[in-house]
């Protein structure tokens, strides 16, 4: 690289990927720090009770998965529902590495996008960088909708943040720019 320091817009983009919630966010305890890995989700895609959604991903850091956070979750019918997660290695899809569940009560939400929903595993799940995993998302409600944060660019300058960097595509399912 010809640069002596990191370019500020690239560092700002990296900061956003670590701190601005997408639809699905992995919290990986790595060494002395937590690495937050956002995962893309199709905008407006309903997860139905009889059709679990399988989300394939590859961790960008070695460490222990302690929790998964949905940026915004809501049940389309606005009824209380249970949401269950199952994590498996892609090489052994029938062997669950961990399970977690959480209750979603859409009746208490003022935000039309829904509310954050946190899933904590009973035990931390070791993840290996560059190994493939599958996260299965299931609901017993009408239709589960997940959404990431909405990013607003208040400028006509054509270099709005965040940039595509480190394998992340901010508008490819991580964030919305339609709200």
Placement of each model-derived feature along the sequence:
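C-terminal luminal/periplasmic domains and tails of membrane-associated envelope-modifying transferases
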Residues: 8-179
